[in-house]
Amino acid sequence: MITKKLTEVTQVTSPSDGYLTPIHDGTGLKAITFANLRSKVNEPVNASITALSEKEATDISTVNALVAPLVYNNAGAHNAIYRGKNLGTSLTDAQSKVIKAGTFDDLYIGDYWVINGVTWRIAGFDYWYRCGDTECTTHHVVIVPDSNLYNAKMNDTNITTGAYVGSLMYTTNLATAKTTISNAFGDHVLSHRIYLNNAVTNGYPSGGAWVSSTVDLMCEEMVYGSGIFHPVSTGSTVPANHRVEKSQLPLFALEPSRITNRGTYWLRDVVSAAGFAFVYGSGNADYYGASLSGGVRPAFAIS
């Protein structure tokens, strides 16, 4: 038998699986194929890779579960997320399409369009959906401008006779707002049915009727989430507060700073025989005599 030193043996750089490699097990010299040696050496590495892959799969699944609500395409999910993205200078056909479909893809609370110098901000999705004496079945986006469009009186004198529907604001002073909004969104402005007060007795709203609405002042519930100054039941006198706007707009719930724009603006609620509810420029809830020239900051829906 010829004996050679290891350094004298011909070296190979690409061993085949069948090559034999000497190995000592502590009792004597043995041989192991290169394939078996490679498999044994890689066992802990393969185990680590398998464990890592399983963990990654679990982590990805967890992340997907957490992210999923952010991409659900329905009003409920989109009403729960404030984003505040600039959507452009006009309502696009693509945006209108997803609104009509009720999926609201890539539209979230706080997103806005800047049209004709006015910032029109998304305040809610499907807020009036399924409401009205004639059911609203049109998917829609509620819009509220960031700033007051202009100033106007509720009435020429400090009276609330006829409530909101009987006011100068409703009959005349909202006309400019309707024109401005129509110029910005055209025939996308939605007409839907709401209940509005039309009579007052001793400072209480005492009557109302279902009307078709396109552009109207907000009520306290839409802004604050509850009534603040408008009259409620005394046990013997029950106001005609049969409104469909029973909950706060998501815009104001998710980002309360949007309630105040540092300009006072009217709400449509009768507070007394002389005044209507008001959001004061300092951010506090308030009311004022109807003859004050206050801000007009209406809400409306587009589809």
Per-segment meaning from a language model:
Residues 41-74:
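Heptad-repeat coiled-coil amphipathic alpha-helices that mediate oligomerization/assembly
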